[in-house]
């Protein structure tokens, strides 16, 4: 069984993230969306809130699971039996970063990094941008995030 991990902070999940999840679900027997967190960063949503939001959004994808990650990515991959890491690339800056991380991960464990190019309509979407425009009261957030996330953002930011 081919198992892939799609890790991220997902604060919040964007349509770009969702596109990568959907495409990865067609490539692997199982995809685990790994909700990571950085205790040094102030997140808008808790890991548990992100897990609930993402689980609702991907509920129609039978081979996709959502879990909160602990420890190193490669350690979490061993726990879930994943050999592949899926990452999305929006631009060359993302590529440089992901290439370096892929090298470290492959040095630590027998893992392969699969890089998927963002679709043109998602290349400018980032969680930071979504939070910024959401905090300014933008009404058309559905262009950037799934509806359940729009509702959660409106509740959290207003």
Curated annotation (Swiss-Prot):
A cellular component annotation (GO) from this entry: cytoplasm
Residue numbers binding substrate: 9, 41, 73, 87
Keywords on record: ATP-binding, Coenzyme A biosynthesis, Cytoplasm, Magnesium, Nucleotide-binding, Nucleotidyltransferase, Transferase
Keyword Lipid metabolism part of the UniProt annotation: no
Amino acids binding ATP: 9-10, 17, 88-90, 98, 122-128
Biological process per Gene Ontology, one example term: coenzyme A biosynthetic process
Family statement drawn from the similarity comment of this UniProt entry: Belongs to the bacterial CoaD family.
Protein name per its UniProtKB record: Phosphopantetheine adenylyltransferase
Species: Leuconostoc citreum (strain KM20)
Gene: coaD
